[in-house]
C-alpha cells in the first residue's frame, strides 16, 4: 500500500517536473520574442537542425480549432497550391470541385475563377486544415471578407534585407504596444509579420495599422523600401470585382516545416521550441485598441507620412492653399547643423551622419500617395499591380537622390528643422549661343516671361492659343545657351521648327532636330521627340549636352520614358510648358519634381480678340440607352454600342450639315477610328472640303492633309473630322469656330484642350459653339456630362 502511494507520488513529482520544464520552455520561447534585436543569419539547413517537433504531429481537434481561431479568412473558399511539372511554375488558385473538368472548367479560356459560371468552390473545413498541417496539400486563405472586414493583418517581407526589415518592424510593434508574430515564409527567403484581431474589423483600419507600423519603422530603419506599403494582407479595403483579394499561405505546412520554414521565429531567426504554445499565447488586438492606435497615428500624420498631392482638386493646384501639402511632425533626437548636397541631374544628399528618421523625411519630399490606387479601390478593381505610394527618390550607396524640382521643398524642410544646406552646383553651364528674339510679346506674355526668367527652372501654365511657343522662343534668346526642346509628337516638332525660325534671329542651319525624317542635331538649338531619345530602355547620351531644356506639353513628363530623359539630363535651366497641369492619373507632382514649381499661371490671357469671343454650349439630348443586366458595365462596352447607335449618329450628322449651311467652320471629334470612318463615309460628297486626321497616319498622308487644309480659301466650306488624341495638342487652325463632341469625355484637361482649338483669334470670329451630346439615359454618361459642364462653366460657356 505504502509502495503504491510512494510510486504514485514519484509519478506526480515527475509529471510536475515535466510540466514545469514545459512552462519554462514556453516562457523562454515567448521571452525570446521580446529579447534584444539580433539579425544573425540562420540558413535553412540550420533551421532544419534546430526545428522543433513538427506542428503537424499529435494533431488534435483542439489544435485545429486553435489554428482556425487565429488564421481566419473566408470560409466559403480557399486557395490551393499547384505546380507545373512541365515548366516548374507554381501558383495558387481557388479550390474548385470542377477544376479542369472537361467541358465545364473555363480556365483554358483564360476566365477568372471568381467569374466562372461553372465555379463550385470547396469550403474551408477542419479536414482541409488537417491535410495542410500533415503536408498532403498547401493552402492559403483569403483574409478579406465580402463585407470589407478581416480578422488578421499580415505584412510580407521578401527582399534581400527581409531579416533586418522584419525584425525592425517587430521592434516597432513592441514599442507601440502591438502584439505580433514573426513567421519565416514557405520559401525560406522571406517572412510574414502577423497581427490578429479579437473580432472582425474594417479592412481599411487594419491596413492603416500596417501602414502606421511601416511608417514608424522607416524612422529607425533607413533601408525599408516604400514598396512595403504594397505588401499587406489584405491588400485593399474592399473585395475587387471578379476576385477575392490577395491570398496568404498558411503556416505549419509539414513539408515546409521539415525544412525549417512556415514556423514562428525568435529574433535570432530560430524557430521557437513550442509553436502551438506560442500561438496560443499571442494576444489579439481589440477594436478599441485598434481605434486608439489609429487615432494617435492620424493625429501625428503617421499612417502614410506623405501628402495626397492635388489629384482630387477642382481648383488650379498652383492657386491652392499650402494646406494641401502634408505637415510632418517634429523629429526627435539630435540633428546635424548642416547637410551636404550636390545639384546635378538630380539633387544628391550625402547620407553620412544622417539619422534614419531624417533620411526618411528627406525621401518623403519626393513621395506622394498614388491617386490611381485609391481610384481603383473605390471602383472595386484589383490594385495588385498598382502601388499605394509613388516615390521618386533614388537610393545610392552614399547618397539619396531627389528630383531637381524638390530643391525648394528640401530647403523648406531643412529650414523648419534648423539645418543648413551646403549645396554644390555641378550643373554644366552649357554652350553660349548668339541669338535674339525678333518678335513682339504682348503685355501678358511679357509678364509671364519676366516671372520665368527669374528662376533656373519652372513651369508655365497657360491656355491654348496664348503663345507658349513664342514665350519659349523668347526664353531661348534670354538664356543664350544651347537648348534642347522636347516634344512627344512629330507634329509638334515641325511646329517648333517653323516658330523658332520665325522668332529667333539665328541661322536656320543651327536649328536641328533629333527624330523624324530629317535627323540632324546641331548642338546649339535642337528639337527632339521623346521617342528618339529613349530607345530600348536607354536614354541617349546627347541629353547631357544642353544647358537649357524646354519641355513642351510637360504634363506628359510622368510617363516613364519621358521622366527618365529628364532624370538623366543635367541642364542648368528647365522650362515646362502646358495648358493643363492636371492629369487623369493624378501623377501631377512628378511634373513639378522634374521641371520645377509653377512660376506663372492662370493670369496669362489670350489676345483681346479671343477674350471677346462669345462662348456657347449647345446641349443635345440623345435617345441612346444601354440596357444590360450588369449593375456596373464597363465603359468600353457602352462606347461599342454607342458609336453604332443610328439615332444618335443621325442627330450629329444633321447638326453638322446645319452648321455648314450656316457658314460655320466645324470640327468633329471622336475617340474611335471606326466612328471617324463612319462619319467620313456618310458625309462624303456632302461637304466641299473634308479633312480627316487621326493618330497613326503616315507622314505623307498627314502632310497631304495639312497641305489641303492650308490651301482652302477662308470663304470656302470645309469640315475637319479627327480623333481627339490627334487634335488635343499642337493642332493650330484659327478658323475653327464650332466643335461637335461626338464621344463623351469627363476629364477637365481634355475639355480644356478641345475648347482651346476654337478660341484662337481669327478675323471675323465672334462666337464659338460646342455641341455636346448628352446621353442622359445612361447614368455613367450623364455623370460624365455633369463633370464636363463644370469645366464649360469655368471657361465662360453659356448653356443653351
Predicted regions and their residues:
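DNA replication initiation modules
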Residues: 138-170, 198-321
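Conserved helix-turn-beta segment of the N-terminal RecA-like "Helicase ATP-binding" lobe
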Residues: 214, 491-517, 684-687
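Conserved pre-motif I regulatory segment
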Residues: 391-395, 413-416, 422-461
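Conserved helicase ATPase core of P-loop NTP-dependent helicases/translocases
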Residues: 494, 510-521, 538, 677-678, ...
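Post-DEXD/H (motif II) to motif III coupling segment of the RecA-like Helicase ATP-binding lobe
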Residues: 547-548, 555-616, 792
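Conserved interdomain hinge at the start of the Helicase C-terminal
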Residues: 630-671, 678-681
Amino acid at each position: 500500500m505504502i509502495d503504491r502511494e510512494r510510486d504514485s507520488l514519484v509519478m506526480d513529482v515527475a509529471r510536475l517536473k515535466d510540466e514545469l520544464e514545459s512552462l519554462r520552455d514556453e516562457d523562454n520561447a515567448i521571452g525570446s520574442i521580446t529579447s534584444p534585436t539580433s539579425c544573425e543569419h540562420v540558413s535553412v539547413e540550420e533551421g532544419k537542425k534546430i526545428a522543433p517537433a513538427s506542428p503537424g504531429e499529435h494533431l488534435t481537434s483542439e489544435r485545429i480549432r486553435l489554428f482556425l481561431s487565429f488564421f481566419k479568412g473566408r470560409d466559403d473558399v480557399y486557395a490551393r497550391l499547384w505546380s507545373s511539372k512541365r515548366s516548374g511554375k507554381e501558383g495558387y488558385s481557388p479550390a474548385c470541385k470542377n477544376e479542369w473538368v472537361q467541358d465545364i472548367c473555363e480556365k483554358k479560356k483564360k476566365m477568372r475563377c471568381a467569374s466562372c459560371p461553372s465555379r463550385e468552390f470547396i469550403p474551408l473545413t477542419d479536414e482541409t486544415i488537417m491535410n495542410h498541417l500533415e503536408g498532403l496539400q498547401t493552402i492559403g486563405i483569403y483574409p478579406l471578407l465580402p463585407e470589407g472586414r478581416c480578422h488578421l493583418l499580415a505584412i510580407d517581407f521578401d527582399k534581400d534585407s527581409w531579416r533586418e526589415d522584419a525584425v525592425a518592424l517587430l521592434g516597432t510593434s513592441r514599442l507601440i504596444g502591438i502584439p505580433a508574430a514573426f513567421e519565416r515564409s514557405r520559401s525560406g527567403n522571406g517572412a510574414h509579420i502577423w497581427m490578429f484581431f479579437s473580432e472582425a474589423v474594417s479592412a481599411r483600419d487594419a491596413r492603416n495599422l500596417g501602414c502606421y507600423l511601416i511608417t514608424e519603422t522607416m524612422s529607425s530603419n533607413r533601408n525599408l523600401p516604400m514598396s512595403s506599403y504594397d505588401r499587406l494582407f489584405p491588400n485593399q479595403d474592399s473585395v475587387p470585382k471578379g476576385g477575392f483579394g490577395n491570398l496568404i499561405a498558411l503556416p505549419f505546412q509539414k513539408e515546409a516545416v521539415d525544412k525549417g520554414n512556415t514556423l514562428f521565429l525568435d529574433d535570432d531567426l530560430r524557430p521557437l521550441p513550442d509553436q502551438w504554445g506560442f500561438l496560443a499565447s499571442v494576444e489579439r488586438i481589440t477594436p478599441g485598441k485598434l481605434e486608439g492606435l489609429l487615432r494617435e497615428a492620424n493625429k501625428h500624420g503617421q499612417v502614410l507620412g506623405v501628402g495626397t498631392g492635388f489629384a482630387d482638386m477642382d481648383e488650379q493646384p498652383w492657386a491652392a492653399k499650402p494646406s494641401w501639402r502634408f505637415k510632418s511632425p517634429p523629429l526627435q533626437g539630435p540633428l546635424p547643423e548642416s547637410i551636404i548636397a550636390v545639384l546635378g541631374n538630380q539633387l544628391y544628399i550625402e547620407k553620412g551622419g544622417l539619422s534614419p528618421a531624417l533620411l526618411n523625411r528627406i525621401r518623403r519630399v519626393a513621395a506622394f500617395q498614388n491617386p490611381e490606387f485609391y481610384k481603383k479601390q473605390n471602383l472595386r478593381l484589383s490594385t495588385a499591380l498598382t502601388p499605394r505610394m509613388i516615390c521618386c527618390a533614388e537610393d545610392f550607396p552614399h547618397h539619396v537622390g531627389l528630383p531637381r524640382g524638390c530643391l525648394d521643398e528640401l530647403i523648406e524642410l531643412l529650414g523648419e528643422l534648423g539645418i543648413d544646406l551646403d549645396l554644390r552646383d555641378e550643373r554644366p553651364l552649357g554652350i553660349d549661343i548668339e541669338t535674339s528674339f525678333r518678335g513682339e510679346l504682348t503685355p501678358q506674355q511679357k509678364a509671364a516671361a519676366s516671372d520665368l526668367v527669374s528662376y533656373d527652372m519652372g513651369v508655365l501654365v497657360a491656355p491654348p492659343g496664348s503663345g507658349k511657343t513664342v514665350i519659349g522662343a523668347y526664353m531661348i534668346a534670354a538664356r543664350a545657351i544651347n537648348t534642347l526642346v522636347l516634344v512627344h509628337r512629330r507634329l509638334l516638332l515641325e511646329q517648333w521648327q517653323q516658330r523658332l525660325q520665325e522668332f529667333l534671329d539665328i541661322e536656320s542651319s543651327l536649328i536641328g532636330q533629333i527624330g523624324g525624317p530629317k535627323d540632324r542635331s546641331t548642338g546649339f538649338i535642337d528639337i527632339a521627340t521623346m521617342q528618339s531619345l529613349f530607345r530600348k530602355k536607354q536614354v541617349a547620351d546627347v541629353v547631357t549636352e544642353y544647358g537649357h531644356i524646354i519641355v513642351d506639353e510637360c504634363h506628359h513628363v510622368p510617363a516613364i520614358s519621358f521622366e527618365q530623359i529628364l532624370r538623366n539630363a543635367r541642364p542648368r535651366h528647365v522650362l515646362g510648358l502646358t495648358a493643363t497641369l492636371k492629369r487623369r492619373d493624378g501623377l501631377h507632382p512628378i511634373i513639378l519634381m522634374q521641371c520645377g514649381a509653377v512660376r506663372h499661371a492662370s493670369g496669362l490671357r489670350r489676345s483681346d480678340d479671343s477674350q471677346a469671343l462669345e462662348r456657347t454650349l449647345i446641349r443635345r439630348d440623345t435617345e441612346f440607352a444601354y440596357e444590360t443586366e450588369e449593375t456596373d458595365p464597363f465603359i468600353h462596352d457602352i462606347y461599342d454600342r454607342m458609336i453604332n447607335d443610328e439615332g444618335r449618329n443621325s442627330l450629329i450628322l444633321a447638326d453638322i450639315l446645319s452648321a455648314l449651311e450656316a457658314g460655320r467652320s466645324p470640327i468633329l471629334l471622336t475617340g474611335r477610328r471606326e466612328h471617324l470612318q463612319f462619319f467620313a463615309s456618310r458625309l462624303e460628297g456632302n461637304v466641299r472640303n473634308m479633312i480627316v486626321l487621326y493618330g497613326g497616319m503616315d507622314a505623307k498622308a498627314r502632310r497631304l492633309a495639312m497641305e489641303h487644309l492650308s490651301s482652302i480659301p477662308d470663304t470656302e466650306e470645309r469640315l475637319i473630322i479627327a480623333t481627339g488624341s490627334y487634335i488635343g495638342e499642337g493642332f493650330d487652325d484659327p478658323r475653327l469656330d464650332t466643335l461637335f463632341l461626338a464621344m463623351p469625355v469627363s476629364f477637365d484637361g481634355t475639355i480644356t484642350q478641345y475648347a482651346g482649338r476654337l478660341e484662337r483669334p481669327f478675323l471675323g470670329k465672334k462666337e464659338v459653339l460646342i455641341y455636346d451630346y448628352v446621353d442622359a439615359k445612361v447614368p455613367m454618361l450623364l455623370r460624365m456630362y455633369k463633370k464636363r459642364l463644370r469645366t464649360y462653366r469655368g471657361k465662360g460657356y453659356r448653356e443653351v
